[in-house]
Amino acid sequence: MLQAIYNETKDLMQKSIQALNRDFSTLRSAKVSVNILDHIKVDYYGTPTTLNQVGSVMSLDATTLQISPWEKNLLKEIERSIQEANIGVNPNNDGETIKLFFPPMTTEQRKLIAKDAKAMGEKAKVAVRNIRQDANNKIKKLEKDKEISEDESKKAQEQIQKITDEAIKTIDESVKNKEDAILKV
């Protein structure tokens, strides 16, 4: 019964860490990632659709991305969506593909993006702490219902705290690594 709570807690905390890493992939660092375009939607016959579902997106070098739509009639729509997304780049449409040339980041931009990474990390920590609180509430309910003793409850809550500390440590390391990657010139 307690093992199930531990496993569920670990699983939920791991999902929070995975969500943080997905969020990090949308932040720009020294090398531009195709994931920076993940949130951009294109109007595909009346349906908002992600870019990677209407064409291939690839990195040509550290500062250039190329979008090759599967249907050439989508070029203008993709171009419009990128401009509206306000990601700090103008699309270059050559009639076949769209190239995005990202200028090198200024020190100020790097600091702002690093600040965003830190905020994402704090959000993940809050999620982990909420998961800890839910697990502790389940343990307290078991104690209240006389399914476990007070000693077992205290030990279980200590175990949940250890799991939480590991998750927070992982988040802190991820944030530090991302900040280092962003601030590296």
UniProtKB/Swiss-Prot annotation:
<dbReference type="InterPro" id="IPR023584">
    <property type="entry name" value="Ribosome_recyc_fac_dom"/>
</dbReference>
<comment type="similarity">
    <text>Belongs to the RRF family.</text>
</comment>
<dbReference type="Pfam" id="PF01765">
    <property type="entry name" value="RRF"/>
</dbReference>
<dbReference type="GO" id="GO:0005829">
    <property type="term" value="C:cytosol"/>
</dbReference>
<protein>
    <recommendedName>
        <fullName>Ribosome-recycling factor</fullName>
    </recommendedName>
</protein>
<dbReference type="InterPro" id="IPR036191">
    <property type="entry name" value="RRF_sf"/>
</dbReference>
<comment type="function">
    <text>Responsible for the release of ribosomes from messenger RNA at the termination of protein biosynthesis. May increase the efficiency of translation by recycling ribosomes from one round of translation to another.</text>
</comment>
<dbReference type="GO" id="GO:0002184">
    <property type="term" value="P:cytoplasmic translational termination"/>
</dbReference>
<keyword id="KW-0648">Protein biosynthesis</keyword>
<dbReference type="InterPro" id="IPR002661">
    <property type="entry name" value="Ribosome_recyc_fac"/>
</dbReference>
<dbReference type="GO" id="GO:0043023">
    <property type="term" value="F:ribosomal large subunit binding"/>
</dbReference>
<keyword id="KW-0963">Cytoplasm</keyword>
